[in-house]
Swiss-Prot record:
It holds the Pfam family Sox17_18_mid. One of its GO terms (biological process) is cell differentiation. It comes from the Eukaryota. Residues 246-362 form the Sox C-terminal domain. CDD domains: HMG-box_SoxF_SOX7 (cd22046). This is Transcription factor Sox-7. Residues 32-41 have a biased composition (Basic and acidic residues). Residues 19-41 are annotated as: Disordered. Induction: By maternal vegt. The gene is sox7. The keyword Ribosomal protein does not apply. InterPro entries: HMG_box_dom, HMG_box_dom_sf, Sox7/17/18_central, Sox_C, SRY-related_HMG-box_TF-like.
Length: 362
């Protein structure tokens, strides 16, 4: 073994240690590069403020041992500015002497400012081999031959596996006029998956371009409200359809003809996809006064007793003993009232009831 190692020249350097070589040459022991740089670095000559602050800083540090060095520097700066030019002159002359001496000692000196220390990065690069090795827990698993997919492909696929995606695409591409038993649905479901109501609305955008007048006309004709959600068989209609005589027409304010916009004109487009969407949720419950909009004025007038206001208008013409009370309605048994007065009273009662009804709704 020794004969083999003796044939190589690099084994001679192993005989003596590097420390022995350094000591034999009379050199100092090995030092770090930072210490060497501090020794070889040439300091700049002090200016007048540095010459003055050299002794003044020591004096302030003794007087205020608890102050930080930054606070001492602020105090020194204020004190230096407060000095007069006559007081600064000896320090300026001393600084000039140091500058000349520095030029004689280092004629080729050039000021090189120190570079700012770079902040160490906390996040270091991880070796790809180590990362792949830590992720692959099963050594016998087959690698993916398709490679890495982009983020756009992942968003389009939505995280579904390949087989499920193919089934969903096949279901979407299947024509709707075919036999329902021939269609294949994903995940082995006997019925198609429910679609989002927003997706169904997006498929038919033409219904959203209708104007308010067309919506009102369609609501009046009764072509939008489905039978299972309508609360009353009679829809809202205009007051022009109710026969009211001329004297009471000025007391009636106009009533809006547009019904509530909960069921918009796009209801039929959603109803066409009823097989895919399932049963829609019922409309939200409104207070009781909203249902008055869906009851016609004719029905309200038909339920009102026209003789209700006669007791207030004809009290002076009849005997109090002739009046009877039935529940909450007081009916008068007057026989001396002419038919013309009765019709006028009925018209005023109808107009008053209609006015208060429309006022309470609005």
């Amino acid at each position: 073994m020794t004969t083999l190692m003796g044939s190589y020249s690099w084994t001679e350097s192993l005989d003596c240690s590097p420390m022995d070589g350094d000591l034999s040459d009379g050199l100092s022991p090995h030092r770090s590069p930072r210490e060497k740089g501090s020794e070889t670095r040439i300091r700049r000559p002090m200016n007048a403020f540095m010459v003055w602050a050299k002794d003044e800083r020591k004096r302030l540090a003794v007087q205020n041992p608890d102050l930080h060095n930054a606070e001492l520097s602020k105090m020194l700066g204020k004190s230096w500015k407060a000095l007069s030019p006559a007081q600064k002159r000896p320090y300026v002359e001393e600084a000039e002497r140091l500058r000349v001496q520095h030029m004689q000692d280092y004629p080729n000196y050039k000021y090189r400012p120190r570079r700012k220390k770079q902040i160490k990065r906390i996040c270091k690069r991880v070796d790809t081999g180590f990362l792949l090795g830590s992720l692959s827990k099963d050594q016998n698993s087959v690698p993916d031959t398709r490679g890495c997919r982009t983020a756009m492909e992942k968003e389009e696929n939505g995280g579904y596996p390949g087989a499920a995606l193919s089934d969903i695409r096949h279901y979407r591409e299947t024509p709707s006029n075919g036999n329902k038993y021939d269609q294949t649905y994903p995940y082995g479901l006997p019925t198609p998956p429910e679609m989002s109501p927003l997706e169904a609305i997006d498929q038919d955008q033409s219904f959203y371009s209708t104007s308010c007048s067309e919506d009102c006309h369609s609501h009046i004709n009764g072509a939008v409200y489905p039978p299972e959600y309508s609360r009353s068989p009679i829809l809202c209609s205009h007051l022009s359809q109710v026969p009211i005589p001329q004297p009471g027409s000025s007391m009636i304010p106009p009533v809006p003809t547009c019904p509530p916009a909960y069921y918009s004109s796009s209801y039929h487009s959603i109803h066409n996809y009823h097989a895919h969407l399932g049963q829609l949720s019922p409309p939200p419950e409104h207070p009781h006064y909203d249902t008055i909009d869906q009851i016609s004025q004719a029905e309200l007038l038909g339920e009102m007793d026209r003789n209700e206001f006669d007791q207030y208008l004809n009290t002076s013409l009849q005997d109090p003993t002739e009046m009877t009370i039935h529940g909450h309605v007081q009916v008068s048994q007057a026989s001396d009232i002419q038919p013309s007065e009765t019709s006028l009273i009925s018209v005023l009662a109808d107009a008053t009831a209609t006015y208060y009804n429309s006022y309470s709704v609005s």
